[in-house]
Amino acid sequence: MSEAYFRVESGALGPEENFLSLDDILMSHEKLPVRTETAMPRLGAFFLERSAGAETDNAVPQGSKLELPLWLAKGLFDNKRRILSVELPKIYQEGWRTVFSADPNVVDLHKMGPHFYGFGSQLLHFDSPENADISQSLLQTFIGRFRRIMDSSQNAYNEDTSALVARLDEMERGLFQIGQNGLNDFQCWEKGQASQITASNLVQNYKKRKFTDMED
């Protein structure tokens, strides 16, 4: 049976999300703590909670602390106009970066943020003085966890991996699944259950170009 949804690759590790990707859509709706640096007229009804029996002013006052979806915070952020400033989520602050540098494998990334790497990469958009430390922490965390993830995916044939997978960020889960698929394909090949072997796309494209050159 064909899949109802053709998976589109995430673009969150680049400068912009890919809004044809369900992973990026979900990631862009995660909340980001911000502080307004100027009053925001006529938006109080949208962003401020009403207290019992009180009416909400039409403006969001300067200095208000809000939690906005990532996509909205990115749209409102402007270095020149200083509409809002961003507060780093705890998982990306120095305390947690120290934990990651000590042993990144002890952290349940999915519990802390299911799109840890993608969301962290998008934080670099806000020109924080900690951007260099954040990017380095993201890279070193990924490197520190990658080997264990792939080793587990290659040595867990027909085993229960739910406890391990439950602790992985969404991107890590994708890598784990790729490793599992490769292992399953290899096991099928060893047992003679593989389908007909075909040339890779790279080889086929090379042959097509070579044939075209010969015709010319």
From Swiss-Prot:
InterPro entries the UniProt entry points to: GINS_A, GINS_bundle-like_dom_sf, GINS_Psf3, GINS_Psf3_sf, PSF3_N
Location relative to the cell: Nucleus; Chromosome
Domain of life: Eukaryota
GO biological process, one term: mitotic DNA replication initiation
This protein's GO CC annotations: CMG complex; GINS complex
Keywords: Chromosome, DNA replication, Nucleus
Cross-referenced Pfam families: PSF3_N, Sld5
Residue ranges of the region described as Not essential for folding and stability of GINS complex, but may regulate accessibility to the central complex pore: 1-16
Family: Belongs to the GINS3/PSF3 family.
Function (record text): Required for correct functioning of the GINS complex, a complex that plays an essential role in the initiation of DNA replication, and progression of DNA replication forks. GINS complex is a core component of CDC45-MCM-GINS (CMG) helicase, the molecular machine that unwinds template DNA during replication, and around which the replisome is built.
Subunit comment: Component of the GINS complex which is a heterotetramer of GINS1, GINS2, GINS3 and GINS4. Forms a stable subcomplex with GINS2. GINS complex interacts with DNA primase in vitro. Component of the CMG helicase complex, a hexameric ring of related MCM2-7 subunits stabilized by CDC45 and the tetrameric GINS complex.
Protein known as: DNA replication complex GINS protein PSF3
